[in-house]
Design a protein with these regions (language model features):
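Conserved ATP-binding/catalytic core of the eukaryotic-like protein kinase fold
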Residues: 1-168
Length: 168
């Protein structure tokens, strides 16, 4: 595939995991270090509107967020004009998946998830970063803990979609 040819050699695409209006997420295998990763690839039109410099700036800001309940960004790049970033592959379900299959969650578990997500948001806010797209599909479960995905990148994507500039 064209995307595979454009990605750095250390990544081998395994399968598409999710597709949205502005991006696709792939399971990939990284060769060094050897591990499974998720690669989020932005739509080409959105990549062009966003611009490499703005994207890199947002990824650099987001990559500074080191918190147990925030999905880290390992790397980012430009694959033939298509912007992408690499994060850990999290095999667990999203909160959206759990709510769809289980309905209401027990109150104690709901409170635990809320505390973990609030801790992640507080950490980011302390660093001047706002998620702006917090929703059940961006809350994933890893080893029984809630982790927030797409941190900071949502701000860049919304700005590019609307033609606006970044704000704090």
């Amino acid at each position: 595939e064209r995307l595979q040819a454009a990605l750095p050699e250390r990544y081998t695409l395994v399968q598409e995991l999710d597709r949205g209006g502005m991006s696709r997420v792939y399971l990939a295998r990284e060769s060094l270090p050897e591990r499974d990763v998720a690669i989020k690839v932005l739509d080409e039109e959105l990549s062009a509107r966003l611009g490499r410099e703005r994207f890199v700036r947002e990824v650099e800001l987001t990559s500074r967020l080191q918190h147990p309940h925030i999905v880290p960004i390992y790397a980012a790049g430009d694959a033939g004009g298509t912007l992408f970033y690499v994060m850990p592959y999290i095999a667990g379900q999203s909160l959206r998946d759990r709510l769809d299959t289980e309905g209401l969650l027990p109150i104690e578990e709901s409170l635990q998830i809320t505390r973990q997500v609030a801790g992640a948001l507080e950490h980011a806010h302390d660093k001047g970063i706002v998620h702006r797209d917090i929703k059940p599909s961006n809350i994933l479960f890893q080893s029984g803990h809630a982790v927030v995905a797409d941190f900071g990148i949502a701000r860049a994507l919304r700005a590019a979609e609307s033609g606006g500039e970044f704000t704090q």
